[in-house]
Amino acid sequence: MLQSVSVMGVVIYLGLVGAGLVAAFAFSTLLRSIKLI
């Protein structure tokens, strides 16, 4: 029971980190495109 909860927490944590990286990459790309215009 406790092990499954910890695994679920790790999966959620990795998902949040991945989403944060994608959002940061998209944001930096958006800023670059604005500067180019």
Swiss-Prot record:
The keyword Transport applies. Keywords: Electron transport, Membrane, Photosynthesis, Thylakoid, Transmembrane, Transmembrane helix, Transport. Its main location: membrane. Disulfide bonds: none annotated. The keyword Transmembrane helix applies. One of its GO terms (cellular component) is plasma membrane-derived thylakoid membrane. Belongs to the PetL family. The 4 large subunits of the cytochrome b6-f complex are cytochrome b6, subunit IV (17 kDa polypeptide, PetD), cytochrome f and the Rieske protein, while the 4 small subunits are PetG, PetL, PetM and PetN. The complex functions as a dimer. This is Cytochrome b6-f complex subunit 6. It comes from Synechococcus sp. (strain CC9311).
